[in-house]
Amino acid sequence: MLPVVALVGRPNVGKSTLFNRLTNTRDALVADYPGLTRDRKYGQAKFEKRQFIVVDTGGITGDEEGIDAEMAQQSLLAIEEADVVLFLVDARAGLLPADQGIADHLRRINKQIFVVANKVDGIDGDSESAEFYSLGLGAIKQIAAAHGRGVSQLLQDALKPLESDFPDMEIIDEAPEEEEDAESQRQRLQELPIKLAIVGKPNVGKSTLTNRILGEERVVVYDMPGTTRDSVYIPMERDEREYILIDTAGVRKRKKISEAVEKFSIVKTLQAIEEANVVLLVIDAREGITDQDLSLLGFVLNSGRSLVVAVNKWDGLSTDIKDDIKREMDRRLGFIDFARIHFISALHGSGVGNLFESVQEAYMSATKRINTALLTQIMEMAQDDHQPPLVRGRRVKMKYAHAGGYNPPVIVIHGNQVDDLPSSYKRFLMNYFRKALEIMGTPIKIEFREGNNPFEGKKNNLTLAQQRKRRRMMSYYKEKK
């Protein structure tokens, strides 16, 4: 599980600027997945060899009404679920009543909090930040998010205390030649239960589907402190295969006796996706493909998880409406053509039984053993069918390929100038490998490594005989001139 860092503060203090810097994003597009939008408030961030989830909670002033009040409530929920809170204030504007109001709320929660004075570029940061000590939340960290000043030190201080509680936070670099590590990883995955996360936006029928799969009312309504943080982990067995169901809808808040409203948490959903081997994304057929569905798909793809899509509430729809929905899915979900899509009714059970065939297929594809000889052969076939382009007048040469990891499958290609391959050719290779290996239900990651020249940096030392020959040749050419 990855830790969660929440960015908190009133409007216009620079939360979005810091968010973009941490997640390396500037717009709503996800690289290499045309047509997919990214939620600007939630993202995956990497700092040095650590990764974490960052949440931009939006501006909170304390006097919100209507829909703004609902958004503020979601922000407060994100704060409750965070492991570290970065409380941003504007060093140029000074301490305002809204800052004091947010500080009053933060004092009541038991979280690690850092007060971050932003926009200190071009001013005396120490003197301008001094008044924020009156908030009573400890030392003040000074940054200029727009230019990156002070951000590295801030992250060092914020993430260091979390290392013992979140061992998954560390990114482990696998050496390309260590294929044994990839194979041992594959064997471990084969022996463990399949972790299946059921995710989707509120009220699409996640709990109904979970109960239908389990055959009993297991996902109950909780009303206890502490249950808002964790997803529900349910062990089960199907077709002689062990599973762990990660249910993100297991925690709900009862408003009325007859009405249970899901307490939706994107943070909890992101953590479930990171934890899972296969993600079952539930979409409401009656609402079509929404931006929130696309955001969740973006998180799944960025995490490299296997994917199965279940379009729920399919029963009762007319043939014309069903055809319209299928056309919309073809148009908007073309970038996940590797994933199986099922049309189901969780309430009545139709189509639910077929889901696990696709879940197993996706997991087997993600953990399939692929040897170096086969991968290199497929790479050479792809190279023969469609030659790599010229780069600076030279043809890119791919030499060999091997497995670099599993879940998702990682293919490492070595060669000359491979880093300069255009994205279109990389997509061609990805599709070629997928078709040749019959991989379904999981994304493929291809890494490119430049071939090292063994003579690079070495001086050519001539023997005495070679030196005499070289002198004779040089004198010969001089005489000819």
Swiss-Prot record:
Cross-referenced Pfam families: KH_dom-like, MMR_HSR1
Single GO molecular function: ribosome binding
SUPFAM superfamilies: P-loop containing nucleoside triphosphate hydrolases (SSF52540)
GTP-binding among keywords: yes
EngA-type G domain mapped to chain residues: 3-166, 194-367
Gene Ontology annotations of biological process type: ribosome biogenesis
Binding site for GTP 2: 200-207, 247-251, 312-315
Binding site for GTP 1: 9-16, 56-60, 118-121
Residues covered by the KH-like domain: 368-452
Keyword GTP-binding: yes
Keyword terms, alphabetized: GTP-binding, Nucleotide-binding, Repeat, Ribosome biogenesis
Disulfide bonds: none
Stored CDD domains: EngA1 (cd01894), EngA2 (cd01895)
Similarity comment text for this entry: Belongs to the TRAFAC class TrmE-Era-EngA-EngB-Septin-like GTPase superfamily. EngA (Der) GTPase family.
UniProt subunit comment: Associates with the 50S ribosomal subunit.
Protein role: GTPase that plays an essential role in the late steps of ribosome biogenesis.
Full protein name: GTPase Der
Gene assigned in the entry: der1
